[in-house]
Swiss-Prot record:
Residues 6-188 form the tr-type G domain. The keyword Protein biosynthesis applies. It is found in: Cell membrane. The keyword Phosphoprotein does not apply. Transmembrane segments: none annotated. PROSITE patterns: G_TR_1, G_TR_2. Pfam families: EFG_C (PF00679), GTP_EFTU (PF00009), GTP_EFTU_D2 (PF03144), LepA_C (PF06421). Keywords: Cell membrane, GTP-binding, Hydrolase, Membrane, Nucleotide-binding, Protein biosynthesis. It comes from the Bacteria. The gene is lepA. It is a peripheral membrane protein. This is Elongation factor 4.
Length: 601
C-alpha cells in the first residue's frame, strides 16, 4: 500500500433529518481551511436552491479535504454528504458503497430517531466502521449521557468515546477529524491492478457531457486512457479526471482508494448509469463491482405538459434528470383530459414533489401533475393477474375477482405523551398494530402495518402535525394484501376527467369524494352555464356540488310591465344556458389539480 493510500480516509455522514449533517460538513470544510471565510456559506454542499430553501439535502455530494493531524501527517479526507430523508434512502446506500466509514450524527436533545436507525442498518450492511457523534450539545435541552446510552442500547455501538460537539458553534470539531483519522480504515486496493471504479453519481454538463463521480477500488485512471463501461460495453476516451475541492479540480490521475470525477465526452445519457463499473478497455477487470440494487418506485403519478409546453421538452428534461437520479422511472401515456404525457415512478411523496419542482425550476417547464397512486395487484375473473399503476386502467368491476394493495411495515418513534394520537391516526389510516416497545422512559417505538396508499398521501405531514414535529417514521414495503377497494371517478359537467380518478378504500370513498367535489367547486372558475361536479363509484353518484352560472340580468330593461313578458325573457335565457351547457367545455385550471392533491381530511 503506497503512502498516499494509507493517508486517505473515505467517509460519509449519516443522520436523521435536521440532526445537523450539512452543518457538520460545513464545519469540517471550515476547520480544514478548504474554503476561505469569504466564500463560506451555510449548507455549502447543498448546491440546489431547493435544498437551501427547504433546509434538506436531496443529492449526495462529495468533497476532498486536506487535514494535518496531530501525528504530523497530512491526510486526504473524502467526505460524501448524504440525504437523511427516507425517500432518499437509495442515495444514502450509494454514497455508503463508496466509503469505509460513516459518521453517525445524533442530536443530543432528540436522541435516536427512526431514520437514524434505518441509515445505520444501511451502513452495517456495507460493513462500514461507524463512529457515533453527539451534536447540538450547546442546546439547553441537551442530554448527551442519556443519548450515549440510547445509541448503545438501540444500535449496539460503543459510544463512551463519542465526541460531544456543536456543529453550529464549531465546538470540538477537531475531535471529529482526529476520530476519522484514527478509526476509519484506509482504503484497500492495488494501483497496479486493472482499473475498477464504481460510478456512485453522475450529472450532465453541457460542455463536458456526462460527468461521472467515481470511487476507484483498483488500478489508476488517467487523462487520454480509453475506458469501458462494464454494463453497456461502451468505450470512451477520458478527457479529464479530478476531485471536488469544492469546485472541480483537475488532477493527473485518480488511483485506488480515491474519490473523484471522470469526464469522457459521453454524450449519450444512457451509457453512463449510476452503479456501473468503469474499467480499462485495453486491460479490463474480470468481475464488475456489485452495483446497487435497483430502487423500486412506490408512488406513480402522471406528468403532462401544461399550456403551450411541448411534449418533447418534458421528455428531454426527464431524461436529463434520470442521469442524476437513478430512481426516477417514466414511460409515455395518454389521457383523454390532458393529452400526451408521462407516467412517472417515484420513491415517495417528497421525492415526487422535489422532482416536480426541479422540472419547473431547472428546465423552466410548465407541467400538470395528477394525483399520486401506488401499484395495485388485480386478479381478474379469468385468473389473469395485472399490475395497475394508473387508476384509469383498472378493469370493470364485473371482471375483477380481487384487488390487492401494497402494505408497508412502519416503525414510528414518538414521545410517550403522543402514543394515543398516533394510534388514532394509524387507525384512521386502516393501520394494524403489531407491537410497541419503550426505548427509554420518554420515548416509544410503535410497529404498524399500514396500507401504502394511506402513507403516500399525507401521512407524514399528519404525523408531524399531531406529534408537534416529534414523531418520526421509517417504512419498508412488506407485500400485498387483499382489500375492498373501489375506483372513484370525478365527473365535471357530466364528463369523466380521467386524470382525477383514483383508487380508494370503500369506507373512505364518500368522505374523499365529497371533499374533492367541494375543493374543485372552489377552484374551477364560474362559466356562463351551471356546472355539476360529481363523484361516482361505478355508475352510482355518491357526492355532488354545483357551480352556479354567471348570468346577465335580462330583466334590467323591464321597468314594471307585465309578468308574462318577464317570464318570456327568463325562459329564453334558460333555453340559451341549456344549449350552452350541451356544447360548452369546462376549463379546469392546474391549480384545481394541485388542490385535490392536498386534501385535508
Amino acid at each position: 500500500m503506497d503512502n498516499k493510500q494509507s493517508r486517505t480516509r473515505n467517509f460519509s455522514i449519516i443522520a436523521h433529518i435536521d440532526h445537523g449533517k450539512s452543518t457538520l460538513a460545513d464545519r469540517l470544510i471550515q476547520q480544514t481551511g478548504l474554503v476561505s471565510e469569504r466564500d463560506m456559506k451555510s449548507q455549502l454542499l447543498d448546491n440546489m436552491d431547493l435544498e437551501r430553501e427547504r433546509g434538506i439535502t436531496i443529492k449526495l455530494q462529495n468533497i476532498r479535504l486536506m487535514y494535518k493531524a496531530k501525528d504530523g501527517n497530512e491526510y486526504y479526507l473524502n467526505l460524501i454528504d448524504t440525504p437523511g430523508h427516507v425517500d432518499f434512502n437509495y442515495e444514502v446506500s450509494r454514497s455508503l458503497a463508496a466509503c469505509e466509514g460513516a459518521l453517525l450524527v445524533v442530536d443530543a436533545a432528540q436522541g435516536v430517531e427512526a431514520q437514524t436507525l434505518a441509515n445505520v442498518y444501511l451502513a452495517i450492511d456495507q460493513d462500514l466502521e461507524i463512529l457515533p457523534i453527539i451534536n447540538k450539545i450547546d442546546l439547553p435541552s441537551a442530554r448527551p449521557e442519556e443519548v450515549k446510552n440510547e445509541i448503545e442500547d438501540l444500535i449496539g455501538l460503543d459510544s463512551s468515546e463519542a465526541p460531544l460537539i456543536s456543529a453550529k458553534t464549531g465546538l470540538n470539531i477537531e475531535d471529529v477529524l482526529e476520530d476519522i483519522v484514527k478509526n476509519v480504515p484506509p482504503p484497500k486496493g492495488d494501483n497496479e491492478a486493472p482499473l475498477k471504479a464504481l460510478i456512485f453519481d453522475s450529472y450532465y454538463d453541457a460542455y463536458k457531457g456526462v460527468v461521472a463521480y467515481v470511487r476507484v477500488f483498483e488500478g489508476t485512471v488517467k487523462k487520454g486512457m480509453t475506458i469501458k463501461m462494464m454494463n453497456t460495453n461502451k468505450k470512451f476516451e477520458v478527457t479529464e479526471v479530478g476531485v471536488m475541492a469544492p469546485g472541480q479540480t483537475e488532477l493527473s490521475e485518480l488511483s485506488a482508494g480515491d474519490v473523484g470525477y471522470i469526464a469522457a465526452s459521453i454524450k449519450d445519457i444512457r451509457s453512463c448509469r449510476v452503479g456501473d463499473t468503469i474499467t480499462d478497455s485495453n486491460n479490463p477487470t474480470e468481475e464488475p463491482l456489485p452495483g446497487y440494487k435497483k430502487a423500486t418506485p412506490m408512488v406513480y403519478c402522471g406528468i403532462y405538459p401544461g399550456e403551450g409546453e411541448k411534449y418533447e421538452n418534458v421528455r428531454d428534461a426527464l431524461e436529463k434528470l434520470q442521469v442524476n437520479d437513478a430512481a426516477l422511472e417514466y414511460e409515455a401515456e395518454t389521457s383523454a383530459a390532458l393529452g400526451f404525457g408521462f407516467r412517472c415512478g417515484f420513491l415517495g411523496l417528497l421525492h415526487m414533489e422535489i422532482m416536480q419542482e426541479r422540472l419547473e425550476r431547472e428546465f423552466n417547464l410548465d407541467i400538470i401533475t395528477t394525483a399520486p397512486s401506488v401499484i395495485y395487484r388485480v386478479t381478474k375473473m379469468d385468473g389473469e393477474v395485472v399490475m395497475i399503476q394508473n387508476p384509469a386502467n383498472l378493469p370493470e368491476p364485473s371482471e375483477i375477482k380481487m384487488i390487492e394493495e401494497p402494505i408497508v411495515k412502519g416503525d414510528i418513534i414518538v414521545p410517550k405523551d403522543y402514543v394515543g394520537v398516533v394510534m388514532e391516526l394509524c387507525q384512521e389510516r386502516r393501520g394494524n398494530m403489531l407491537n410497541m416497545e419503550y426505548i427509554d422512559e420518554r420515548r416509544v417505538m410503535l410497529h404498524y402495518d399500514l396500507p401504502l396508499n394511506e402513507v403516500v398521501y399525507d401521512f407524514f405531514d399528519a404525523l408531524k402535525s399531531r406529534t408537534r414535529g416529534y414523531g418520526s417514521l421509517d417504512y419498508e414495503v412488506k407485500g400485498y394484501v387483499a382489500s375492498t377497494l373501489v375506483k372513484l371517478d370525478i365527473l365535471i359537467n357530466k364528463e369523466q376527467v380521467d386524470a382525477l380518478s383514483f383508487i380508494v378504500h370503500e369506507t373512505r370513498a364518500f368522505p374523499r369524494g365529497k371533499a374533492m367535489c367541494e375543493k374543485l367547486k372552489g377552484e374551477i372558475p364560474r362559466h356562463q352555464f351551471a356546472i355539476p361536479i360529481q363523484a361516482a363509484v361505478g355508475n352510482k353518484v355518491i357526492a355532488r356540488e354545483t357551480i352556479s352560472a354567471l348570468r346577465k340580468d335580462v330583466l334590467a330593461k323591464c321597468y314594471g310591465g307585465d309578468i308574462s313578458r318577464k317570464k318570456k325573457l327568463l325562459e329564453k335565457q334558460k333555453e340559451g344556458k341549456k344549449r350552452m351547457r350541451q356544447i360548452g367545455s369546462v376549463e379546469v385550471p392546474q391549480k384545481a389539480f394541485m388542490s385535490v392533491l392536498k386534501l385535508d381530511e
